Amino acid sequence: MAGHLASDFAFSPPPGGGGDGPGGPEPGWVDPRTWMSFQGPPGGSGIGPGVVPGAEVWGLPPCPPPYDLCGGMAYCAPQVGVGPVPPGGLETPQPEGEAGAGVESNSEGASPDPCAAPAGAPKLDKEKLEPNPEESQDIKALQKDLEQFAKLLKQKRITLGYTQADVGLTLGVLFGKVFSQTTICRFEALQLSFKNMCKLRPLLQKWVEEADNNENLQEICKAETLVQARKRKRTSIENRVRGNLESMFLQCPKPTLQQISHIAQQLGLEKDVVRVWFCNRRQKGKRSSSDYSQREDFEAAGSPFTGGPVSSPLAPGPHFGTPGYGGPHFTTLYSSVPFPEGEVFPSVSVTALGSPMHAN
């Protein structure tokens, strides 16, 4: 870089120089790197108007320093109304209008603004934000249709004598999926979401058709209701019967099938009820015995704290040990800080006899 600049200085006059000497360059030519690096301040000595006008003449900011040169070329951002510096030198200045137009066209064609949004983008956003009137009309029509069908379903159900739970069970018989009474109630009250209403509508429509055409649907629904009730049946035993079962369990915790049938006949219960009760009672006894054994093991292990025995806090005053242990002793309190002299408990006289006695 230094060699190039030295060679340029040898053939280029310094700023403010004449350049008319022998062997000097022509008055209309100057090296761009030398011109960039030797621009004078405004009002000072610089390149004369006969050679090339400087940046101060045009009112432009100074170009970057020489170390920003890339490949021997000085880079300046294209300015509107100013012609670019040709790489070989400046031969003739271009008019401002033509130069400005050329720069604008080159800048627009070479480096378009990447941040500029396309012209059609706002239109697309507006189209997305604005709802389609046809779709809104279709949704409103579907909502009205669902409202009318919900009213029809409720009227048909009440007329045929079905409950909401019966409708759910019948759907399970017809389509293999049982719906709860809450779901049917929310459908009739239009409390389900629009999506769930649309999913449930075809199934209920088929139920309405089957209810009109199939006379045995009521019987099928009753049979399914009995099956579901048997599955969910919860047995309740009276206290008197439970007491008799408890006494029999103490005598024989695991009765045979004959004994179970005999007990069921005596108490007026079903065999399965008696059998299940004895099974549950044995499991309960196992759990209680395991809990008791765990508690005994914990007590036998003792305190988890290491060290000597931990004394329990007792009432203040002297406490005596067992006879023959070594005389009376005092139970250690939790606090190791001695009492003040003014608050010491009154001393109690102790008579050493065969057995410890409290003094009056």
From Swiss-Prot:
PTM entry text: Sumoylation enhances the protein stability, DNA binding and transactivation activity. Sumoylation is required for enhanced YES1 expression. Ubiquitinated; undergoes 'Lys-63'-linked polyubiquitination by WWP2 leading to proteasomal degradation.
Keyword field: Cytoplasm, Developmental protein, DNA-binding, Homeobox, Isopeptide bond, Nucleus, Phosphoprotein, Transcription, Transcription regulation, Ubl conjugation
GO biological process: regulation of transcription by RNA polymerase II
GO CC entries: cytoplasm; nucleus
Binding site for DNA: R157, Q164
Compositionally skewed regions (Basic and acidic residues) per UniProt: 123-137
Cross-referenced CDD domains: homeodomain
GO molecular function, one term: DNA-binding transcription factor activity, RNA polymerase II-specific
Motif (9aaTAD): 4-12
Residues found modified as Phosphothreonine: T235
Family that this chain belongs to: Belongs to the POU transcription factor family. Class-5 subfamily.
Subunit comment: Interacts with PKM. Interacts with WWP2. Interacts with UBE2I and ZSCAN10. Interacts with PCGF1. Interacts with ESRRB; recruits ESRRB near the POU5F1-SOX2 element in the NANOG proximal promoter; the interaction is DNA independent. Interacts with MAPK8 and MAPK9; the interaction allows MAPK8 and MAPK9 to phosphorylate POU5F1 on Ser-355. Interacts (when phosphorylated on Ser-355) with FBXW8. Interacts with FBXW4. Interacts with SOX2 and SOX15; binds synergistically with either SOX2 or SOX15 to DNA. Interacts with DDX56.
Region (Disordered), start-end ranges: 1-48, 86-137, 287-322
Protein known as: POU domain, class 5, transcription factor 1
Gene encoding the protein: POU5F1
DNA-binding region in chain numbering: 230-289
PANTHER family to which the protein is assigned, alphabetical: POU DOMAIN, POU DOMAIN, CLASS 5, TRANSCRIPTION FACTOR 1-RELATED
Positions bearing Phosphoserine: S111, S236, S289, S290, S355
The record's note on its domains: The POU-specific domain mediates interaction with PKM.
Region (DNA-binding): 180-186, 193-196
Expression by tissue: Expressed in immature oocytes.
InterPro entries, alphabetized: HD, Homeobox_CS, Homeodomain-like_sf, Lambda_DNA-bd_dom_sf, POU, POU_dom, POU_domain_TF
Subcellular location: Cytoplasm; Nucleus
Ranges of residues in domain POU-specific: 138-212
